[in-house]
Amino acid sequence: MSKVAPHLLIVDDDKELCSLLSKFLSRHGYRVSVAHNGSEMASILEASRVNLVILDLMLPGEDGLVLCRRLRATSTLPIIMLTAISDETDRIIGLEMGAD
């Protein structure tokens, strides 16, 4: 019986970063899907079983904190917040919104 690779969802509007992360994680045995905004994230989550979401803080439209709060309201899916900002306040807010 073969083991199914964990499925990760990267949500980030930076296509170059998504490509880099996707290639790296795929080489390490993960299945990876990519969304560039909240709408794409919702579509992927509805269509597939995902084991972990890697969510950017700064997205066009709804930001990562809003998406994290919405996801946390209906799911216990692990969420890792990803950001280029190193502001302690944003980290605290992310944890309060339910990021892991």
Say what each PLM segment does.
Residues 1-100:
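N-terminal/domain-start alpha-helical segments
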